[in-house]
Amino acid sequence: MPRRREVPKRDVLPDPKFGNVEVAKFMNVLMLDGKKSVAERIVYGAFDQIEKKAGKAPIEVFSVAINNVKPVVEVKSRRVGGANYQVPVEVRPSRRLALAMRWLREAAKKRSEKSMALRLAGELLEAAEGRGGAMKKRDEVHRMAEANKAFSHFRF
C-alpha cells in the first residue's frame, strides 16, 4: 500500500426517511453484499415495530440505545518483556460509534425472533432501557478494563 497521503474519510449521506446520518451509518453496518435496499427494509421495519411496541419516536429510541451501548474504555494487548498485558485505553469517539453499531448488529443476530427487523427492534428497545446483549458486551469490555487498571501505565 502506498504511504503517500492519508485518504480522507468520506461523509455518509443522511438516510432518506429520517435525514439522520447515524441511521444511514447503521444501515451500512447492517448491509451484506452491497444490498442496501434490504438493509433499509430491515431498519425501517424495526423502527415501525418500535413505534408499535413502545409508542415512542424510533429515532429517539435508536439514539438512546446507541449512546447506552457506546464503550468508554477498552483493552489493547501490549507486549512488555515477554509478557502480554491487557492495557486499558480510552476509545476514540468514531470507534465508540462503530463498536456500538457492530455490537447492536451482532446481539440482534443472536436473538430468537422470526425476522431480523423484529430482532433489531427488540435489541434497540432493550439497549435503550439498559438491558440486552449489546449492553452485556459493553459491560464485559468495561469490566475487562477495570480488572486491568493496574497496567494502565503501559500507555500506547
UniProtKB/Swiss-Prot annotation:
Q: Which GO terms describe its cellular component?
A: small ribosomal subunit
Entry keyword RNA-binding: yes
Instruction: Name the domain of life.
Output: Bacteria
Has UniProt tagged this entry with the keyword Thylakoid? no
Q: Which InterPro entries match?
A: Ribosomal_uS7, Ribosomal_uS7_bac/org-type, Ribosomal_uS7_CS, Ribosomal_uS7_dom, Ribosomal_uS7_dom_sf
Which Pfam family is an annotated match for this chain, by its short name? Ribosomal_S7
| UniProt keywords, alphabetically | Ribonucleoprotein, Ribosomal protein, RNA-binding, rRNA-binding, tRNA-binding
Q: Which GO terms describe its molecular function?
A: rRNA binding; structural constituent of ribosome; tRNA binding
Q: What GO biological process, any one, is recorded here?
A: translation
Gene3D superfamilies assigned: Ribosomal protein S7 domain
Name residues in a coiled coil. none
Q: What family is this protein classified in?
A: Belongs to the universal ribosomal protein uS7 family.
**Record HAMAP family:** Ribosomal_uS7_B
Q: How does it assemble?
A: Part of the 30S ribosomal subunit. Contacts proteins S9 and S11.
Describe its function.
Answer: One of the primary rRNA binding proteins, it binds directly to 16S rRNA where it nucleates assembly of the head domain of the 30S subunit. Is located at the subunit interface close to the decoding center, probably blocks exit of the E-site tRNA.
Q: What is this protein called?
A: Small ribosomal subunit protein uS7
Origin species, per record, is: Cupriavidus taiwanensis (strain DSM 17343 / BCRC 17206 / CCUG 44338 / CIP 107171 / LMG 19424 / R1) (Ralstonia taiwanensis (strain LMG 19424))
User: Which lineage?
Assistant: Bacteria, Pseudomonadati, Pseudomonadota, Betaproteobacteria, Burkholderiales
